[in-house]
Design a protein with these regions (language model features):
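Zinc-dependent deaminase catalytic domain
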Residues: 1-141
Length: 141
């Protein structure tokens, strides 16, 4: 009897690649962010495709987000903007990693900023896979 003749056999027609799978996990983690404008998620995996850590952007742990501004009007003083309080997804994941990230890959929903790029490099991340880069057409890029 051939395998296909078995009534319990089914053929997988379509399966996610590892890159698709981990990017979907990063996208799901971004939904934990309370930021009304920008939701970013990240997932770090080792060379065996085991998840090491994940993160999303949000205020510093332990701070009541109702007390801080989510505004992003750069004409306002920094204390009235989210930028002085929000920890980026990559930084949150690195801070909560249970082990070394050396040699890992980072899947992130938004191209890392300069500060996060430095953290990624310093943590030994060997590859960054991003979903979008909303600043790619700006003059500073």
């Amino acid at each position: 009897m051939e395998l296909k003749d078995n009534p319990n056999y089914f053929e997988v027609k379509s399966m996610l690649t590892w890159d698709e799978y981990f990017m979907l996990q990063a996208m799901i983690s971004s939904f934990k962010s309370k930021d009304p404008a920008t939701k970013v998620g990240s997932v770090f995996v080792d060379e065996k495709n085991h998840q090491i850590t994940m993160g999303y952007n949000g205020f510093v742990a332990g701070i009541d987000e109702r007390l801080l501004p989510w505004g992003k009007d750069k004409s306002q003083p920094l204390e009235h903007q989210k930028y002085g309080y929000v920890v980026h997804s990559e930084a949150n994941a690195i801070l909560h990693a249970p082990r070394s990230l050396a040699g890992s890959r980072c899947y992130v929903t938004l191209f890392p900023c300069n500060e996060c790029a430095k953290l990624l490099a310093s943590s030994g991340v060997k590859e960054v896979i991003y979903l979008s880069d909303k600043h790619q057409d700006t003059e500073s890029n």
